[in-house]
């Protein structure tokens, strides 16, 4: 400003009623008494020093600002303060900034004395009737603030909202906003803070009304209190939108209160591009650190910047006025009617001021209201505050391209969502080492993997936490909801990701995405599976008692068969009737060993070489064969069932069977969708089931699926639950089975608060995961791998060693016993042969063992040692004739031995002395028995050949002096024939 112009300011009028303007004096009324306050004192000092430093004038013409403190907002104290200001001869009064009632009193007194009043606070309401001499206001008018809020609501398409008022006159201040809701017929609920200044009840009402847009009309301190309480109630999530009318929004410290995903909008008038703005902020910061080290400096308050601009505006107006006339000051008093004669002129010049200050462009209309200014729209972000748009005083709203939008992909990107869930296998489970982990890493499961896929697809972050009461959600008698539904309604969570069933009743209070899994209600019950198959499972078809009785029956049949064969004369017969020499020798094939072996062959269905002859033995055999036929058939039929399919005994087969009986209890999860299904069902069977479950004591409802499974396994209890969880638990426990089919059809979805802007985007993401088969892959990951096979797989399964390994053990044991018996027989036979042949046992054993292990020899000669004493008598013809037949081969009964003792079978030996040794036997008669055995035919053929020479070694006298010949082997058929 030119020095010559300011020199005019210090020239006093010659009028006798005015004093010479020795200095440009102003009065500032401050209603903030704290040193660490809004910085208004410092702002006034900065403005004064800046003006006085630029203008080189004498000290008596310098700008002076007298500060008066207002202790409380009262008309009496304000009037008293004004009475102290008037005698000082001020050209203008500034403030107060935060006391509309006091500001109204100051305006009234200044109007009476015609002293310009510069308002730096909100406009009083109701506005005083327009006077001839009025004040000017640097603060935005109520109409402008109301219009700005209304335009923001329309821009973001917020149909309904709730207004929290700190004072009753807020409806008048926001008259344009209320009028806009009335015209659009949208809902605007208004709630007033009481004298306690506790916003908690109001916030709870808003939460219960499911309103997501909240407008707060209060100063900075009360707005901060409301947001802090909202954070405690979980109402600062991404689903809530806050719009604050205070112009001190930039200095609100919200980082420790709200979340990163919160949507909080406010206004700012600061012109950050002003050349003096950095110096202004730095000076306030330095002053704050010198005087207020205990608290954090949050930034400059709007009232401080308005005080700074007010000083410059008054100086500019006085400068313009001084160009046209000389002005002077006049001391005034409250008790006199005198006025300042230059006040009206200065007021007119004030309305014509155009100034670019710290709060932007400063201009006034004819009513003294600020015009041609802008309001910066800020959004709270992780980096502080982000400008998302500008509102112009000509009622124009310009939003930036990076602003919030209803486009879901933009709102979800880089957001941190609170996700509530509940522990339910296999959807959400704790990891085995969850205590050593933190955050989302503590959990695993199908829903956890699906949420991770969604977060990667939509680029948002999330924080998993368990629902406080451990319930899915059901309505209470008072209208509230429990569980995850209640947390979504109360906006404590942004999403609910779990085995969350979509129901019509829940859809009324919350939103759901499209189902990510389709299922239905099923019945889970336990079955008796019997013991686990073992190596001796082939014994399972019969009980131990049956096996015992079968053994006793076998022994009884063997004994009866032995006795019947011994008693019946038809079982005694001559085995070789063609040998006429001893016709009275009879045999019985049913020895004790054969009697024990014959039932075994029949039982094993392999037969035996022993055939019954008598009617009694045939009767015993037939009865035993009939017995074994039934036993073997029954065993074969039961063996397949026992080794391939375990027995399952289920007393009920459907929901109707379950409802018609009372022996088996049944229930659902408490406060779950299944319980709600039966509660609201109109089907008669389900109504009866609900009446039973509701009236049954003790309660049949359980708190979790694990508790229901344990109750099923430990008692007669049927559990009603979703089919997917039914399938999962059946795979883990083979003693569980599903009864009947599905009772209904429904789906699992992701829950969100009502009106959530994320619904469409999450639904599209779920559909994309289904199309990519990602959800099916996740299901196979968490459902497969159980201990029990699928019940739908009816293909025949091969039997393993655990089923039939016992029969191999029996076979091995039988082979070991057979080898042991063979060894014992070998030792016993070798020992007897050694005694008869008069050789050592070891020599005989080695000789016999050499023949036994020879692979090429299939026959051998019976070795006989020639005795060292007198020569034995030659084998007589009678001995040859008494040779017995066994299995179609001829064996010698031994020289000098008894024929009856030579063969192993029982026989009847009648005393039949043979013919004299010298007599020639008579010619044999042909064999006349009905059935001629093979050996008889061979003997007849030998006789018919007519060979009369005696065989070698037969008929030679014992006294012969010829050298001894080697021991002959067994006599062949031809030798026998020649001997005869």
UniProtKB/Swiss-Prot annotation:
Annotated membrane topology: Multi-pass membrane protein
Alphabetized CDD domains for the sequence: PBP1_iGluR_Kainate_KA1_2
Pfam family of the protein (one): ANF_receptor
Extracellular side stretches: 15-544, 644-803
Glycosylation sites: 219, 271, 285, 322, 372, 394, 400, 407, 414, 478, 735
Signal peptide (from-to): 1-14
Side Cytoplasmic, residues: 566-622, 825-980
Region (Disordered): 891-927, 944-980
CC per GO annotation: cell projection; endoplasmic reticulum; hippocampal mossy fiber to CA3 synapse; kainate selective glutamate receptor complex; nucleoplasm; plasma membrane; postsynaptic density membrane; presynaptic membrane
Disulfide cysteine pairs (residue numbers): 36-292, 83-334, 165-170
UniProt keywords, alphabetically: Cell membrane, Cell projection, Disulfide bond, Glycoprotein, Ion channel, Ion transport, Ligand-gated ion channel, Membrane, Postsynaptic cell membrane, Receptor, Signal, Synapse, Transmembrane, Transmembrane helix, Transport
InterPro entries: ANF_lig-bd_rcpt, Glu/Gly-bd, Iono_Glu_rcpt_met, Ionotropic_Glu_rcpt, Iontro_rcpt_C, Peripla_BP_I
Annotated compartments: Cell membrane; Postsynaptic cell membrane; Presynaptic cell membrane
Amino acid composition bias (Gly residues), ranges on this chain: 894-903
Protein family: Belongs to the glutamate-gated ion channel (TC 1.A.10.1) family. GRIK5 subfamily.
Function recorded in the entry: Ionotropic glutamate receptor that functions as a cation-permeable ligand-gated ion channel, gated by L-glutamate and the glutamatergic agonist kainic acid. Cannot form functional channels on its own and produces channel activity only in heteromeric assembly with GRIK1 and GRIK2 subunits. Can form functional heteromeric receptors with GRIK3.
PANTHER family: IONOTROPIC GLUTAMATE RECEPTOR
Protein name as annotated: Glutamate receptor ionotropic, kainate 5
């Amino acid at each position: 400003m030119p020095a010559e112009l300011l020199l005019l300011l210090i020239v006093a009028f010659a009028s006798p009623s005015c004093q010479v303007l020795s200095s440009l004096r102003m009065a500032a009324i401050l209603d903030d008494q704290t040193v660490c306050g809004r910085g208004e004192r410092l702002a006034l000092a900065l403005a004064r020093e800046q003006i006085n430093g630029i203008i080189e004038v004498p000290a008596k013409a310098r700008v002076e600002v007298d500060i008066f403190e207002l202790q409380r907002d009262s008309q009496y104290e304000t009037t008293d303060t004004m009475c102290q200001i008037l005698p000082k001869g001020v050209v203008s009064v500034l403030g107060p900034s935060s006391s509309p009632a006091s500001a109204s009193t100051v305006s009234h007194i200044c109007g009476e004395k015609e002293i310009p009043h510069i308002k730096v606070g909100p406009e009083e309401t109701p506005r005083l009737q327009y006077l001839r001499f009025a004040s000017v206001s640097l603060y935005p008018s109520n109409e402008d603030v109301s219009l700005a809020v209304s335009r923001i609501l329309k821009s973001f398409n917020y149909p309904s909202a709730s207004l929290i008022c700190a004072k009753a006159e807020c409806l008048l201040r926001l008259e344009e906003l209320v009028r806009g809701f009335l015209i659009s017929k949208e809902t605007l609920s208004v709630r007033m803070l009481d004298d306690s200044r506790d916003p908690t009840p109001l916030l709870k009402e808003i939460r219960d009304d499911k309103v997501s847009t909240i407008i707060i009309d209060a100063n900075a301190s009360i707005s901060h209190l409301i947001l802090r309480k909202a954070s405690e109630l979980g109402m600062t999530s991404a689903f809530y939108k806050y719009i604050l009318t205070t112009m001190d929004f930039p200095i609100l410290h919200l980082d420790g209160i709200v979340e990163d995903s919160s949507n909080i909008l406010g206004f700012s008038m600061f012109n950050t591009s002003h050349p003096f703005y950095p110096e202004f902020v730095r000076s306030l910061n330095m002053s704050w650190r010198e005087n207020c080290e205990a608290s954090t400096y949050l930034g400059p308050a709007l009232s401080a910047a308005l005080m700074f601009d007010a000083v410059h505006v008054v100086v500019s107006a006085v400068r313009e006025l001084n160009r046209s006339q000389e002005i002077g000051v006049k001391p005034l008093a409250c008790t006199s009617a005198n006025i300042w004669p230059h006040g009206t002129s200065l007021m007119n010049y004030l309305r014509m001021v155009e100034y670019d200050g710290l709060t932007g462009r400063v201009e006034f209309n004819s009513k003294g209201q600020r015009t041609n200014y802008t309001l910066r729209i800020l959004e709270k972000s992780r980096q502080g505050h982000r400008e998302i748009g500008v509102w112009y005083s000509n009622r124009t709203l310009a939003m930036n391209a990076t602003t919030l939008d209803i486009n879901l992909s933009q709102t979800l990107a880089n957001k941190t969502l609170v996700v509530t869930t509940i522990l339910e296998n296999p959807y959400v489970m704790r990891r085995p080492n969850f205590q050593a982990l933190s955050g989302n890493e503590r959990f695993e499961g199908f829903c956890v993997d699906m949420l991770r896929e969604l977060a990667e697809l939509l680029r948002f972050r999330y924080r998993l936490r368990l629902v406080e009461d451990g319930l899915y959600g059901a309505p209470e008698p008072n209208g509230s909801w429990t569980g995850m539904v209640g947390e979504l309604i109360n906006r404590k969570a942004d999403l609910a990701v779990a085995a969350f069933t979509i129901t019509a009743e829940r859809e009324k209070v919350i939103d759901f995405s499209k189902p990510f899994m389709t299922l239905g209600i099923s019945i889970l019950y336990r079955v008796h599976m019997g013991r686990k198959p073992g190596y001796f499972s082939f014994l399972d078809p019969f009980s131990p008692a049956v096996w015992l009785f079968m053994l006793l029956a076998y022994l009884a049949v063997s004994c009866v068969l032995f006795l019947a064969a011994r008693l019946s004369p038809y079982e005694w017969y001559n085995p070789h009737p063609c040998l006429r020499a001893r016709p009275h020798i009879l045999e019985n094939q049913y020895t004790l060993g054969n009697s024990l072996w014959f039932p075994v062959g029949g039982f094993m269905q392999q037969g035996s070489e022993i055939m019954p002859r008598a009617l009694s033995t045939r009767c015993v055999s037939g009865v035993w064969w009939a017995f074994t036929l039934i036993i073997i058939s029954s065993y074969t039929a039961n063996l397949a069932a026992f080794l391939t399919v375990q027995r399952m005994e289920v007393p009920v087969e459907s929901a109707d069977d379950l409802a018609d009986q009372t022996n088996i209890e049944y229930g659902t999860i408490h406060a779950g969708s299944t319980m709600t299904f039966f509660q609201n069902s109109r089907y008669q069977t389900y109504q009866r089931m609900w009446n039973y479950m509701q009236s049954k004591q003790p309660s049949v409802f359980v708190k979790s699926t694990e508790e229901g499974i344990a109750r099923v396994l430990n008692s007669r209890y049927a559990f009603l639950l979703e089919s997917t969880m039914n399938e999962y638990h059946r795979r883990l426990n083979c003693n569980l089975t599903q009864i009947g089919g599905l009772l209904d059809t429904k789906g699992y979805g992701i829950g969100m608060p009502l009106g959530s802007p994320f619904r469409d985007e999450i639904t599209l993401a779920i559909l994309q995961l289904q199309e990519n088969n990602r959800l099916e892959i996740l299901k196979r990951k968490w459902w497969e791998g159980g201990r029990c096979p699928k019940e739908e797989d009816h293909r025949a399964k091969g039997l393993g060693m655990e089923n039939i390994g016992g029969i191999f053990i029996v076979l091995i044991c039988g082979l070991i016993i057979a080898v042991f018996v063979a060894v014992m027989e070998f030792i016993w036979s070798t020992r007897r042969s050694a005694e008869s042949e008069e050789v050592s046992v070891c020599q005989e054993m080695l000789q016999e063992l050499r023949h036994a292990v020879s692979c090429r020899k299939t026959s051998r000669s019976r070795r006989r040692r020639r005795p060292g004493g007198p020569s034995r008598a030659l084998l007589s013809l009678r001995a040859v004739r008494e040779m017995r037949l066994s299995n179609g081969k001829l064996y010698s009964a031994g020289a000098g031995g008894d024929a009856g003792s030579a063969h192993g079978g029982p026989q009847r030996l009648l005393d039949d002395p043979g013919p004299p040794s010298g007599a020639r036997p008579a010619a044999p008669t042909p064999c006349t028995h009905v059935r001629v055995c093979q050996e008889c035919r061979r003997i007849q053929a030998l006789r018919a050949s007519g060979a009369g020479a005696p065989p070698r070694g037969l008929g030679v006298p014992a006294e012969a002096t010829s050298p001894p010949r080697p021991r002959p082997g067994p006599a062949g058929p031809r030798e026998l024939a020649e001997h005869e």
